[in-house]
Amino acid sequence: MANSAQARKRARQAAKANSHNSALRSKYRTAVKAVRKAIEAGDAAQAAEIFKASAKTLDIIADKKIVHKNKAARHKSRLAAAVKGLQAPAAQ
């Protein structure tokens, strides 16, 4: 256990940050899952709309350094490709 006032304060701050960061990581995963679910449903318009909102969420969380920016970019790229793949067959 923390013995100094400074160590107690840092422990409190770490617990608070951990709670906040956990919530944001959960929001990140939920956003990715929502897009994947829309893609599996096969509705291109809905998937594109959900992807647009989710991409913004991924960027915000990456900017806060909750997840690495490259991880967020990788997820966005793969989800965008999947959404585009839904729209391509309909156009032909």
Curated annotation (Swiss-Prot):
Record's keyword terms, sorted: Ribonucleoprotein, Ribosomal protein, RNA-binding, rRNA-binding
Disordered: annotated span: 1-25
GO process annotations (BP): translation
Keyword Mitochondrion tagged: no
Molecular function in Gene Ontology: small ribosomal subunit rRNA binding; structural constituent of ribosome
GO cellular component: cytosol; small ribosomal subunit
Disulfide feature: none
Family to which the UniProt record says this protein belongs: Belongs to the bacterial ribosomal protein bS20 family.
PANTHER family cross-referenced by the UniProt entry: 30S RIBOSOMAL PROTEIN S20, SMALL RIBOSOMAL SUBUNIT PROTEIN BS20C
Function description: Binds directly to 16S ribosomal RNA.
Protein name: Small ribosomal subunit protein bS20
Classification lineage: Bacteria, Pseudomonadati, Pseudomonadota, Betaproteobacteria, Burkholderiales
